[in-house]
Amino acid sequence: MPQHSRYSDEHVEQLLSDLLNVLEKHKAPTDLSLMVLGNMVTNLINTSIAPAQRQAIANSFARALQSSINDDKAH
């Protein structure tokens, strides 16, 4: 069953585009981009989520990330 979001596709796509533009502007290689994005996620969880909920949110995020990874060999 598809998940529904309270955010429009357009809003999500615009944020994604803006974030990608920043990484491209700084010519960030993949490893640096992943490190920065991971640090951003950690910061958001640690500063915006109640301590009792942080582990559950991190686990949910990790599962969502893993399920969205494409297993094809092309890159």
UniProtKB/Swiss-Prot annotation:
UniProt xrefs under HAMAP family: UPF0352
Organism from which the protein derives: Citrobacter koseri (strain ATCC BAA-895 / CDC 4225-83 / SGSC4696)
Family: Belongs to the UPF0352 family.
Protein name, entry field: UPF0352 protein CKO_00587
Top-rank taxon: Bacteria
One Pfam family cited in the UniProt record for this chain: DUF1414
Entries under InterPro entries matching the protein: UPF0352, YejL_sf
Annotated NCBIfam families: PRK13689.1 (NF010242)
